[in-house]
Amino acid sequence: MIFYSTTAPGLEDVAAEELKELGCRIKEERKGKGRVFFEAEIEDIPKLNCFSRCSERIVLLLGRFKVEKLEDVYKAVKSIDFSFIKPEQSFAIRANRVGEHGFTSIDIAREAGQAVIDRYKEDFGVRLRVNLDEPDVIIRCDLVDDDFVVGVDTTGDEALHKRNYRIYQHPAPLNPTIASSLVRLSGWSHNYSLLDPMCGSGTILIEAGMIAKNIPVCKFRENYAYKKLFKLPEPEWEEKDVELKLYGMEKFKKHVEGARKIAEYVGIPVTYIQGDARKLDEYFDSIDFIVTNPPYGLRIARKGIIEDLYSKFLESASKVLEKKLVMITAEKNIARHYAEKFFEIKEERNVMYGGLNCSVFVLE
């Protein structure tokens, strides 16, 4: 069976590598488009939803088409066999559109929905119910330029980044799928120390700890869309007993306290410090890996504050870092200038995150 996963555009190769480790056969990475197509079995769906840390959702592909006009959407969807939907089940279309088109995502959803209803009625004499709020079956219709993919969402309306462990809400939390991707890009493993010097509520450290201890993302979540479609056994897993050297630093006391609550809830031992990321050498003699998401996207009037933070952070990091530093930021020019001054830039990649064109830097 062919599936596709969605991820942050720019991190497709990271998601693909993880999917390979889960036993999938990669068919295509749509670089810059946030899609990875792969082969897997229906029986793999629970495992993929439980252990895909770098993907947003897992979708079972029903069809892939070239679409130029809105009428093409109706024709494409109507050509699909929807016999897997039971007559008593409801459905909803979730449409997404990227590129230049003479129609909207709402138009796609309307045409696709009508096509599903018409095809099912022709085949079975039953008009399927539409339920936009709590559908039994979610059909994804994603149009990227002229590439139209239709699939059954096995994850649900809540994407996989909804880990449900955030018992403390930071005002600007990092998406956990991106956090996991950054950890993977760093090459960190539990044998080494890891520091996030601007940790917020600790997402990067929690994700690193869950990877090291083999804690699945489904530990804190039960509602997956596939459970209304397939009767599949839950994946078996065993938590690893590993020693971790995880350190988080945060400027504000309330965030430190919140991060500690989350770490305790998940069961990840993290040492949190209230401190200044511009003075890392005052807190640490050496750190193997640094992975962080520093502040960015602030008003022009505050660029001076950002430049001071980035310059002093990277300078102090250069005094304690043993291996690699990975950071994501929308402040590309400032980050690049000081990264080149204090490190060697091993990689810079564009990543779309939260509507911002960001860069991920890998430094040594």
Predicted regions and their residues:
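Non-catalytic nucleic-acid substrate-recognition regions in nucleic-acid-modifying enzymes
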Residues: 1-135
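Class I S-adenosyl-L-methionine-dependent methyltransferase catalytic core
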Residues: 1-25, 29-36, 40-44, 79, ...
